Amino acid sequence: MLNSVPLVIAQHSTQDDTSLLNSIGNKWGFPVVSHSEKPAEGFYLQIQNGVLGLADASEKKVLPVEVDFASPASLYRKQHGGGRKEPIVKAIGLKGNEGWHVVDATPGLGRDAFVLVSVGCKVTMIERSPIVAALLEDGIRRLALSFPELAAKMSLQHGNSAEVMQYFTGENVNAIYLDPMFPHKKKSALVKKEMRLFQQLLGHDPDADALLPPALKLATHRVVVKRPNSADVLAGEKPSMAIESKKHRFDVYLCQKP
């Protein structure tokens, strides 16, 4: 897993963008370089119009990957109640439990976390990659500018998810959501550009099975694992039930705590 990439100052960067870029570099330990020092290959971070994005120097025609919780698509889905129809909402068991605290231990770009927040949950995201964590944090920052009530329900912890869950000290966790990165076929048209980039950057999760035991111990009600329909169950552990969608399966593990 790649832990650091350069932060590139855009050629026509504004003072606000440069200030934000330096702040991110100081917090996460990313080296800040000028536009003339932009790498010819590999990944780098940049800020354009106040948005942090991850770019691949070898893919000049591909737009940087960013976390945008306030995108038109996300907000349309929230405003029209689409989130309540999502399989993840059914799997988490939110009917009548909209105020639950959910830990998303594999947040990726945070799309599933935002679905849960949009239906009333409080979500804690745990991310081990400082690069992805920086993108998520920037997404929360920008969401707070327009929708502070939603941003207030999202928090981020940087660290190894299995370890953070094992020693979790926050408020009670009602449910935990796991969506380990699964190796896709190279020619699969279903893998979107950002997921291809993430897989190149982070690889699949070799320790995915290690996430289930601490999750089952921490959650008070259930653990939900998202898997491709063709994938085996996580850690060889048979779920209590499964909810299937067209492309994925949500394995649900009910937790019975004394």
Curated annotation (Swiss-Prot):
Keywords of this entry: Cytoplasm, Methyltransferase, rRNA processing, S-adenosyl-L-methionine, Transferase
Cellular localization per UniProt: Cytoplasm
One GO MF term attached to the UniProt entry: rRNA (guanine-N2-)-methyltransferase activity
Coarse class of the protein's main subcellular location: cytoplasm
EC id: 2.1.1.242
GO cellular component: cytoplasm
Reaction(s) this enzyme catalyzes, per UniProt: guanosine(1516) in 16S rRNA + S-adenosyl-L-methionine = N(2)-methylguanosine(1516) in 16S rRNA + S-adenosyl-L-homocysteine + H(+)
Residues engaged in binding S-adenosyl-L-methionine: R111, D112, E127, R128, D179
Stored InterPro entries: 16SrRNA_methylTrfase_J, SAM-dependent_MTases_sf
Coiled-coil ranges per UniProt: none
One Pfam family, short name: SAM_MT
Annotated CDD domains: AdoMet_MTases
UniProt keyword Glycosyltransferase present: no
Function: Specifically methylates the guanosine in position 1516 of 16S rRNA.
UniProt xrefs under PANTHER family: RIBOSOMAL RNA SMALL SUBUNIT METHYLTRANSFERASE J
Similarity annotation: Belongs to the methyltransferase superfamily. RsmJ family.
Protein name, UniProt field: Ribosomal RNA small subunit methyltransferase J
Lineage start: Bacteria, Pseudomonadati, Pseudomonadota, Gammaproteobacteria, Alteromonadales
